[in-house]
Amino acid sequence: MEQYEVVEQIGRGAYGSAYLVVHKGERKRYVMKKIRLSKQNDKFQRTAYQEMSLMASLSNPYIVEYKDGWVDEGTSACIVTSYCEGGDMAERIKKARGVLFSEERVCRWFTQLLLALDYLHCNRVLHRDLKCSNILLTKDNNIRLADFGLAKLLMEDLASTIVGTPNYMCPEILADIPYGYKSDIWSLGCCMFEILAHRPAFKAADMASLINKINRSSISPMPPIYSSSLKQIVKSMLRKNPEHRPTAGELLRHPYLQPYLAESCSCSPIYLPVKPTKSNLGDKQQSRKPGSGRKRIIKTNGSSEALETAAEQAVDTRDNSTYISDVSTVGTQDACISQVSVDPQARNKAYQNIDDLTLFQQIEENLMTITDRQIDEAIFLKAVRTSSTVDVVPVSGAIQKPNEAPIPKEELTIGVVQEQRKEVKAHTHQGSKPGTGDVPIVTEESSPKSAVKLAHSDSTPAEWDHLNIVQQRADALESLLELCAKLLKQERLEELAGVLRPFGEGAVSSRETAIWLTKSLMTPPKLEGSPKLT
């Protein structure tokens, strides 16, 4: 402590405070987190020590850097980390006053967060408290993930204690189901929704309503200025079934994020785009729709081949300013992995050219899926009622006391420790990475049983399928409305009429509409300027 000079207190929590300090020798600013140990039980003290040990073992450019740590005469534990001049993401959103961030900036933040989260999961670490106030920003607007007070090393396949911030908790935690790394993906999805929309993904006046919204994965539409690809990625992170959520590594390999991944300083070769060799260009190719876990085969008929060729030409634009250039390649029998260098201006131009094609590809798949699969309305209503049924079991001191006012709007970090560990079965949850060590987590409240239980939490696969079909219909409608709005704004009335023709009295098949719309989008005109962003 003698090496540091305290400048001011910059934060206060339930168990300690944060101070801005200056290293006397280096004359460099750091943040010192001081955790009170006096009058705390042994489990809490072990948690503080293990947080210090965990921070010392982490090393990633997008995680706050550990500087020093010690125990001050047994009364408090001190952890010194790097100082981020840009504040936290929650403050940045408030200062924006409703002015939305540019998509390029959001995607850059998103990629950095995924790199940090993938690093944690590869090292068997669950963060368990991902929220905007724990996402810090440097003066260069780069991400630093912070606050590992609730983090856990997975000794078993899954965790079972209920910890975190209610607004960012995933359905399986609230349903008292053992959870794994996909719980962090849900929390990050909530953060990304808040960064995009400048409002929480899930917000309610009371805990029961909040749980109901989370259990139904009921979110409002995101701002229309962002691309469908980005919004679909965020939606995929907020799927109720954890098995249907992507991992951080899978998201990093998404084609839409590849340009931003190439700009990162810790880009691993396993995340670089995979390009097929020339010998395979004529074969059938399998592609994944942006922001979705469903696969579709691109058939070798005239219209689909034309669409695929146009998309490839638009992405692989090679003019005076090179969009993508190969730096080094590692050859394999079927494909080669290529590192890429990116020109941001050329990248934006190329994405502008293929924006209509990408949107059409999503509409085509969703419309064809809905046409082929008819939905029984009675089953649909039953599935919705089943997924929205909530049973809240109050426990004294766990969530809210009877005499207290409703939960305030600000976020509250809660935790309920289960005394008896449940036997974890692999087939009841998504697979996760094996662990070797266990970090006991001390939380604010403890109870023999969890405070929140959801009825009908063990949904059958058939119910998941029905809900997925409903989600597909919603995605298709949203994509269709976005395209119609864009065509109307550009006064492309003939194309707009072609899009809406299948819904008239003399409706034609979705396939005929897809072929017609493909031809009309082969040479898309230049889009008008987008709204001014920050």
From Swiss-Prot:
Top-level taxon of the source organism: Eukaryota
Post-translational modification as stated in the protein's UniProt record: Ubiquitinated by the E3 ligase DIS1. Ubiquitination of NEK6 leads to its degradation via the 26S proteasome-dependent pathway.
UniProt keywords, alphabetically: ATP-binding, Cytoplasm, Kinase, Nucleotide-binding, Serine/threonine-protein kinase, Transferase, Ubl conjugation
Subcellular location: Cytoplasm
Expression tissues: Expressed in anthers, pistils and leaves.
Keyword Protein transport belongs to the record: no
Quaternary organization: Interacts with DIS1.
Protein name listed in UniProt: Serine/threonine-protein kinase Nek6
Originating organism: Oryza sativa subsp. japonica
Gene (name only): NEK6
